[in-house]
Amino acid sequence: MSGSMEGNAVSFKGGVFSPYLTTRLPAWAGVRQNVMGSNVDGRPVAPANSATLTYATVGSSVDTAAAAAASAAASTARGMAADFGLYNQLAASRSLREEDALSVVLTRMEELSQQLQDLFAKVALLNPPANAS
């Protein structure tokens, strides 16, 4: 889309061929939402806020590949969101690793506490209290 400013009016030359840009506007802006559109070749274009998340492109094969990748990613994300078992398994293994690390830290702290008590006992033997005569 290109535009030029002439006085107080804006003149647009070209067009926007993406339903994504228009469907992001609020309904009160006069934009039709969830309405099947078409591209410049007349092929149907689903709106960006539809459940299919498929886009027809008017550009190069790179645009087609990008649209296919975006659609596949959205489909995968929906599938992962529906599969709670995957998330539970990942969360369980992470919590087990965290518990193992915490157990190692607690064991080391107990060892250090014991060493500190031994050191206090040795210092007490070397430096008896002054009032114990």
From Swiss-Prot:
Coiled coil: 97-127
Record has Lipid biosynthesis as a keyword: no
InterPro entries membership: Hexon_assoc_IX (IPR005641)
Domain of life, per lineage: Viruses
Entry keyword annotation includes Coiled coil: yes
Keyword entries, A-Z: Capsid decoration protein, Capsid protein, Coiled coil, Host nucleus, Host-virus interaction, Virion, Virus entry into host cell
Molecular function GO labels: hexon binding
Main location per the UniProt record: virion
Induction statement: Expressed in the intermediate phase of the viral replicative cycle.
Gene Ontology biological process terms from the UniProt entry: symbiont entry into host cell
Localization, UniProt: Virion; Host nucleus
GO cellular component: host cell nucleus; viral capsid, decoration
Purpose of the protein: Structural component of the virion that acts as a cement protein on the capsid exterior and forms triskelion structures consisting of three molecules that stabilize three hexon trimers at the center of each icosahedral facet and fixes the peripentonal hexons. Dispensable for assembly. During virus entry, recruits the anterograde motor kinesin-1 to the capsid docked at the nuclear pore complex thereby subjecting the docked capsid to a pulling force.
Comment, domains: Three N-terminal domains of hexon-interlacing protein form triskelions between hexon capsomers.
Membership in a protein family: Belongs to the adenoviridae hexon-interlacing protein family.
SUBUNIT field: Homotrimer. Interacts with hexon protein; this interaction tethers the hexons together. Self-interacts with adjacent proteins. Interacts with kinesin light chain KLC1; this interaction leads to capsid disruption at the nuclear pore complex during virus entry into host cell.
Note: This protein is only encoded by mastadenoviruses, and may therefore play a role in mammals tropism.
Record-given protein name: Hexon-interlacing protein
Organism encoding this protein: Human adenovirus F serotype 41
Taxonomic lineage of the native organism: Viruses, Varidnaviria, Bamfordvirae, Preplasmiviricota, Tectiliviricetes
